[in-house]
From Swiss-Prot:
HAMAP family, A to Z: XylB (MF_02220)
UniProt site (Important for activity): D9
Protein name: Xylulose kinase
Annotated organism of origin: Lactiplantibacillus pentosus (Lactobacillus pentosus)
Catalytic activity: D-xylulose + ATP = D-xylulose 5-phosphate + ADP + H(+)
Functional note: Catalyzes the phosphorylation of D-xylulose to D-xylulose 5-phosphate.
Top EC class for this record: transferase
InterPro entries in alphabetical order: ATPase_NBD (IPR043129), Carb_kinase_FGGY (IPR000577), Carb_kinase_FGGY_CS (IPR018483), FGGY_C (IPR018485), FGGY_Carb_Kinase (IPR050406), FGGY_N (IPR018484), Xylulokinase (IPR006000)
List of catalytic residues: D240 (proton acceptor)
């Protein structure tokens, strides 16, 4: 067997390790799960040691159960869950459990940042201060755990801690660093303004590197633990969204990525950070040196479908439930669904809005409700596509990944609502493929990530908008756009009633 690279995808619930050859083929894979701790409502934590032990287990399993040998692994890189805070002391020992991206304890710190900096915060970081980001977590520890704060000497993000344990080198790549909202989006350096005004030592911030930068080799200690070779080179890696964009070939501004996971993401490549989205969309550094991406997040994309399935069709599999939508019509026989069942982030940033079915009629069947859910999720994405188009974007292709790419019907619905060609990936591997591409480019197998994509990224069938369908969906979308404004005060009042009773 020829040379391979490893793409290590450190997710929220599991790590997946993929061995990829020079033709972009997945030749071996292994994964391992780890636990999530929720000691209090709104808290979400993990033990960083679990990331190390489970990654090691996955690597050992890959080597033992495949024909890949340690000497064939020329390099590796990472994709990582974003925003999680890992605090280290002067000996680089972890001080407390990592506070994860989905931890919501930091609302008061976010409000303080808004009050102190106003719109300047968006100008500096490209983002609003949201609970998921790392800076509010730092401020929470500073305010609530002063003894730990006094001992802290540096902070890392999840994949950066894993990289440190494998190489002994402390660093953070810039694509992940933007998600801390402590990075100056214009200079791509740590913001001295924020650090000084918030009394955060600049020395707490780790050295910054590019995603494809060479960091070091696997150290002797980790080589003995994992079975890897000390000759294997290690490269920076990227935040999961950046790595996912690389793995999907989102390398130019005429393509958008639509991802339907638990939440939903619409992501666009950006040459610079100059477009003013007024904080509605997040700005992040891309895995490409000097490039960026922006993205809008909807909170309950796949979650809405999962909720519907578990509530109304618990004994059926997802494929059967989704396929039943074919029994309905475009526009679900005049039924609309707003997928705000856990609130919304973009474009509304509203924690109190809730979902609704609009237009329920005695003639509606379950298939109509399924179709309305599928269409409503895509209408929520169309809100973000329209925001991009309002700011001058012209998309020729939309790449669909995740749950929305597993159904031909849903792919056609996307093409018709977006009025754009939609493609899926032939062999969807998620951010792990992007991590492998970063390693392959870092090694010099390819001159650039774009060159690597020519070999590694392949698209499946293209779905084109049907003119008659587009016209019908545009009428439905105009009605859909009224739902938020009309239902917001009602659902906020209902939420308050639930809290009181």
């Amino acid at each position: 067997m020829s040379a391979v690279v490893l793409g290590i995808d450190l997710g929220t619930s599991a790590v997946k390790v993929s061995a990829i050859d020079k033709q972009g083929n997945v030749v071996a894979q292994a994964s391992a799960k780890y636990a999530l701790q929720q000691p209090h409502p709104g808290y979400s934590e993990q033990d960083p040691e679990d990331w190390v032990t489970q990654t090691t287990q996955a690597i050992r399993e890959l080597l033992q159960q495949s024909e890949v040998t340690a000497d064939q692994i020329e390099g590796l890189s990472y994709s990582g869950q974003m925003h999680g805070l890992v605090l280290l002391d002067e000996s680089a020992t972890v001080l407390r459990p990592a506070i994860l991206w989905n931890d919501t304890r930091t609302t008061s710190q976010c409000r303080e940042l808004e009050s102190q900096f106003g719109d300047d915060f968006i100008k500096i970081t490209g983002n609003r201060p949201l609970e998921g980001f790392t800076l509010p977590k730092l401020l929470w520890v500073k305010e609530n755990e002063p003894n730990i704060w006094k001992r802290a000497r540096t902070f890392l993000l999840p994949k950066d801690y894993l990289r440190y344990r494998m190489t002994g080198k402390l660093a953070m790549d810039k694509s992940d660093a933007t998600g801390t909202v402590l990075l100056d989006i214009t200079t791509s350096q740590w913001s001295e303004t924020l650090c000084n005004q918030l009394d955060i030592p600049l020395t707490l911030c780790p050295p910054l590197i590019e995603s494809t930068a060479y960091v070091g080799h696997i150290n002797q200690t980790y080589a003995q633990l994992s079975g890897l070779s000390v000759n294997t080179k290690v490269f920076g890696g990227a935040a999961d969204n950046a790595a996912g964009a690389v793995g999907a070939g989102i390398l130019s501004s005429d393509k958008a990525l639509v991802s339907i996971g638990t939440s939903g993401v619409v992501l666009k490549y950006e040459d610079n950070a100059q477009t003013d989205y007024r904080g509605v969309l997040q700005y992040e550094r891309h895995a490409f040196p000097g490039k960026y991406y922006s993205m809008g997040v909807t909170l309950a994309a796949g979650y809405s479908l999962n909720w519907f399935k578990q509530t109304f069709a618990p004994d059926e599999d997802f494929g059967t439930v989704v396929a039943s939508a074919e029994q309905s019509t475009i526009g679900a026989n005049g039924l609309l669904f707003a997928p705000y069942i856990v609130g919304e982030r973009a474009p509304y940033a509203d924690a109190t809005i809730r979902g609704s079915f609009i237009g329920v009629d005695g003639s509606h069947q379950r298939a109509d409700f399924v179709r309305a859910v599928l269409e409503g999720i895509i209408f929520s994405f169309e809100d973000l596509i329209k925001l991009y188009q309002h700011n001058g974007a012209e998309f020729k292709t939309i790449v669909s990944i995740g749950g929305g790419a597993k159904s031909a019907l849903w792919l056609q619905i996307q093409a018709d609502i977006f009025n754009c060609k939609v493609v899926s990936l032939k062999n969807e591997q998620g951010p792990g493929m992007g991590a492998a591409m970063i390693a392959a480019t870092g090694l010099g197998w390819f001159k650039t990530l774009a060159d690597c994509a020519q070999t590694f990224v392949h698209y499946g069938k293209a779905y084109y908008p049907v003119t008659a369908h587009v016209a019908q969906y545009q009428e439905m979308y105009r009605l859909y756009q009224q739902i938020y404004v009309q239902t917001q005060p009602i659902t906020a009042g209902l939420l308050e009633q639930r809290k009181q009773h």
